[in-house]
């Protein structure tokens, strides 16, 4: 009598195996080999599902559908999300140095509620800031956190990592924009830290006011340059006085004055240059948005279910944190049975 046989999708294509074989039950609910599952998840988190199945076809000469990759990727994204923020990945400091924390939001289009904000955090050491001559600097190693939804869960996730790191570093340095929830969180949770208002975000208020107030381009440019120099030296009150002296009735003048007065304790840029690696701008978190979120999740026409978006964020964070071995480990466990 002929034994029942099953087909498993592998990196060599479909392989028929006996029903009694240990692999016949599949892995995590899929009749797909562990290595093939890993490659499908890797491809799925790198590019849209409509494209990544072509990559697998080209590299392995194995045909898989975009729907297959979607299902496998989503399952692993949900599972790795249970522990994605539990491990510190930064190497210990070689000396007493500053730990930098940046956070910001990015809008993502969801099916259920339209545009929703993804909170993104980036943590890195001062010694990981690399400067090569006059070239733009870069950060050699970072840990990311990404959450779709409210700020309370996001800040708890950030605190879990920061608290594990904080005792090893001489100083915590937060660089953020002026959102009240960020400012209040830092003041409440880390009162002894250095809290910096992103310089470039602050300078945007100068530009917005100058565009409304000055008609002549040369006057506008000259005025902005003068105020930015003062801002760089931490002379916030002087900048505010200069705006008041113009006696502008434009709404941007009021917005600038109120914003600068509310955040002046976080605008001591002349002092911040002497701390750690001397950065006080949001370049690190801006590039993190592009790397972690935009590259994969904000392509033309994309809309996400909220659950699917968080699952993908979990995978993007795992990949960008350099922790892909955690996905490999999951392919070797049995965390999910077939339906």
Q: Language-model features: where?
A:
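An N-terminal, globular interaction/scaffold subdomain
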Residues: 1-7
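Catalytic center-proximal scaffold of phosphoryl-transfer enzymes
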Residues: 8-339
């Amino acid at each position: 009598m002929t034994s029942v046989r099953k087909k498993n999708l592998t990196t060599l294509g479909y392989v028929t195996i006996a029903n009694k074989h240990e692999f016949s039950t599949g892995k995590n609910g899929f009749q797909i080999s562990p290595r093939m599952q890993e490659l499908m998840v890797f491809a799925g988190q790198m590019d849209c599902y409509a494209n990544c199945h072509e990559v697998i076809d080209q590299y392995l000469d194995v045909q898989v559908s975009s729907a297959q990759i979607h299902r496998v990727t989503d399952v692993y994204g949900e599972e790795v999300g249970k522990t994605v923020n539990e491990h510190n990945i930064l190497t210990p400091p070689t000396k007493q140095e500053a730990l930098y924390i940046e956070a910001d939001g990015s809008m993502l289009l969801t099916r259920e509620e339209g545009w929703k904000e993804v909170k993104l955090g980036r943590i890195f050491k001062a010694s990981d800031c690399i400067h090569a001559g006059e070239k733009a600097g870069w950060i050699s190693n970072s840990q990311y956190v990404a959450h779709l939804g409210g700020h309370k869960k996001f800040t708890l996730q950030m605190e879990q990592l920061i608290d594990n790191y904080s005792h090893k570093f001489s100083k915590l340095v937060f660089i953020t924009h002026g959102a009240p929830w960020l400012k209040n969180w830092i003041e409440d949770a880390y009162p002894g830290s250095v809290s910096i208002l992103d310089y470039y975000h602050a300078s945007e208020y100068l530009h917005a006011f100058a565009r409304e107030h000055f008609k002549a381009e040369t006057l506008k440019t000259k005025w902005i340059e003068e105020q930015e120099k003062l801002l760089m030296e931490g002379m916030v009150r002087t900048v505010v006085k200069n705006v008041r002296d113009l006696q502008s009735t434009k709404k941007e003048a009021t917005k600038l004055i109120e914003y600068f007065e509310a955040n002046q304790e976080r605008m001591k840029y002349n002092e911040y240059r002497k701390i750690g690696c001397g950065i006080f701008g949001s370049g690190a978190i801006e590039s993190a948005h592009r790397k972690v979120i935009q590259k994969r999740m904000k392509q033309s026409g994309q809309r996400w279910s909220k659950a699917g978006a968080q699952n993908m964020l979990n995978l993007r964070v795992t990949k960008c944190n350099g922790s892909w071995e955690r996905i490999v480990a999951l392919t070797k466990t049995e965390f999910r049975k077939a339906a």
